[in-house]
Structures are given as C-alpha cells and as structure tokens.
Amino acid sequence: MTLWELVERRSIEAPEAISILFSEKHLTNRAFRDEALRVARGLRELGVGRGDVVAVQLPNIPEYLLSYAAICALGATLQPVHLPYRRAELTTLLGHSGAKAFVCLSRLKDERPPGLKNVVSLGEPEDGAIPFSSLLAKTSLEKPYDGSPDDRFLLLYTSGTTDNPKGVPHAQRGFLANAASSVPELEISRTEVVLSAAPLTHLYGLYAYHVSLCSGATMSLLPAFTPDGLSETVGKHKANCIFAGPAHFKPLLDGGLLERHDFSSVRFACLSGSPVPPELAAAVEKKLPKGKTLQLWGMTELQAGSFSRPRDPAEVRHGTAGAATPGTELRVVDERLQVRGVSLFSEYLKNPEETRKAFTADGWFETGDTAQLSGAGHLRFTGRVKEIINRGGVKYSPLDVEAIIDRMPDVARSAIVPYPDVVLGERACVFVQPKAGAAAVTLEAIMRELDRAGVAKFKWPERLERIEAMPLTPTQKVMRGRLRELLKN
C-alpha cells in the first residue's frame, strides 16, 4: 500500500474522523483528502509528475501534510528541508536533488536559489512565487497516480554532524511497513492522538505521522517547540502518544511544567534524536500521571530501528532503546552496530563511493554507532565511532562523561571532542555552554565532579572551552565536526 492509498482508505472508512488537530482547528479524513487533491492539481499544473522532487520547508502545520499527501498523489517525491536552512544550504540541497518545486513560508530565506523556478509560498507571495491558497482554490485532481509501493516517495538528507549531508532516497514499501509494524508494538489505536515535538522536516517527525496514518489515529500538530507550547497542546488536544527528544522534555522537568499542565491523557512519551540519560527518562515518567517513557533509535537511512515497548519493565524502557522493530535485524561486530531490514535504504543519491563504504561484504549497513546488545536483544548505545576518543591507545566514548557534566548546576550543555597530541595521539577537550546568568564553570570544578562520580581519570577532559551557544543540527544534535574546527582555528 502507498501513502496516498492510506489517505484514501481513511477517507472512505472513517470520513468524519479527525485526521489533523492544529490549534483550535481540525481537518476530517474526508476534508484532508479533498484539500490534498486540490493541492495536487495545482502542483501538476506546475509540471510536477511521477518521479519529480518537491522540496518542502514548512513548520508542523496542516499545509505541510497536505503538500506531502499531494506529492504522493502525483507519484512524486517529498524532500523535507529544515527550517533554519538559508540560501547556502538551499542551493546545495535543492541543486543536488534537482527539485522541480519548492513549498515554503511567505519569505524565502535571503533569496531564491539559482535555477529554482517554481516556488509556492504561504502568506503574501514574493518574487513571483505562487500563493499556496491558489492551489487550495483549484478543482480536485481527477486521477491520482496509481503508484507502486516500490516507488520512491521520500528524499531525506543526513544531518551532517560530522560530514557533508548525503541524499537518502526511500521507497514507500519499506517505510510504511516499518510504521505499520510499530503500531501494534506501541499499542496505538485509531481513537488516540499522536503528537510530535520533532519537526516534520526531520524523519522522527515524519515517523510519528506515518504511525498515526497507519493506525488511523489523529495527528496533533505543534508548529514550533516551546516548553509552554508543547505542554498546552498536550492538554488541549488530549495527546496520548508523544514523540519527542530529551531536549524537549528536560525544560519541562526543570520548569515544573509537567506538574502545572494537564498530562493525564499521555500513555507514553517516546524519546529519541539524541542519547537519553536513564535518570531523565525515569524522572519524566515519575511526573506523568498515567504515562510511561520509552526510547527509540532510528536513522535517516532506516526510520525506526529499535524501540522499547510499553510492556517492557522500567529498566529496559529507561536504560535501553529496546528491541529491534519487526522486520529489522541488529548485530554488533567489534562494538560497531550494524543493521539490515525491510526499511533500510539501498543507496545514497548520486554517491556510489559512500554507498560502497556504508555496507559490509555480507550486506549489513554500518550505522556508525558503537553499542551493546543484551541477551534479550535490547540495544544500549555506547557512542559514535567518529566520537570515540583514543587517548594513548585507550579508547572510550565521551557520552557518559558528558552526562555527568550536564548535571552540574551551572551547565546547560556540554560536548567532548578530541584534539591532536604528539605523545598520546589524542586528548579530550570539553566545550561547555553555561546556563543563563550562571557562574563560569572551571576545568577544576569539572574534574571534582567527575572524581565524585568515580570516573576513571583517563576519561577526564584536559582542556575547557566555554561557548555561548552549542552548534546544533535542526534536530538538536551537537555538531561535533564544527567544534573540532573551532579547536583547529
């Protein structure tokens, strides 16, 4: 089944059920289908057809999902574009993909990338852009593309925390099977409300939508994350299943928002996107009146690779990323996590060399993560291969050390990266972003904290750099490559 066929099926089986909740508004399944067909007609008149790429740079609003469904109704491919990206990133990514159209907010970031002809914008159009409202005013597309599940429908780009982003094409069969198999494991029903704090421009946000679509559940849209905004939306829309990151829930904990707002509807909060400290997962669960915290591990190349289940005991849900998603296999070779399965991509776009390097001789994908698998198949991450620090031949991941430093009262966020050393090969430097108004953190204070925690001295950072704002990807991952460049300069 294709994504458009899922949209059609929902409109037939439950036409008046709610497809999307947004602020005080909603769209039924029938209304969503009808509006998507009008958008599809408008895109077709711009020349978009089977196999073409349409880039979308929108927040979590109905127009994003209407564009997505319309693109699939044409047999075309969605290219999500992160909201912070500006002309330099747009020129690179849209040039690489060969995007035929670009759907964005009312103002292009800086100016239109060269060679981009068809721009559809919300609000007042500029520079010859076409207003999105004119697409909604069209008559419906009469004959949606009768597509195959093996057709490409998504073109994602890796987050580029250490390297230049790579294009990752995906067919419908694998991704939708991955989402559909997640539904019974997460026990999601069509009467529930799914909410993603992650942007729809990122795979984690799209996964939440895929799960809601496959289950028949309602999708609650949060246009931009703020702690108050997330808390208020959960209460207003009675969200049951929340997909978010640790960076979304930590300010809710620190600010007491889980007590002040109504989270009684929440059945689970699934955390992903960056390492989840077990104590954070436990603290969130303690504050949820009826909910549990889960963890999920996924990749641009895979979608959901593993997750803990609501039925799992607390130590599994809080301390691991659970067991493999149905249809996915995991193995650890020399501490390196490898994966294969139905939703795994087959090749990087226009990049055979990176494709060759990404797979083992027997067909397993090298994730770039270091991990451990328990006897029961539960996955626990120990770091990234490129983040491992090799100090005099002794290798270690800095993640556990960072977690301890992050608990210090004056630290907002920390990240440890290696720097070259003539004697030992590498030593560790810690970058610290202080909390607003906090006292300056010293290397001596960090060493005392690590000493109290019983951390082996070879793991202690030997250099401290204070940074006003940690460089982050749009999905809140630390850009360690950028930090290493700062050290070089």
Enumerate the predicted regions with their spans.
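Conserved AMP-binding/adenylate-forming core of the ANL superfamily
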Residues: 16-61, 65-69, 86-91, 133, ...
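Gly/Ser/Thr-rich phosphate-binding loop
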Residues: 214, 239-244, 253-316, 329
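ANL superfamily adenylate-forming
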Residues: 107-149, 255
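Conserved AMP-binding A3 loop
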Residues: 28-31, 153-177
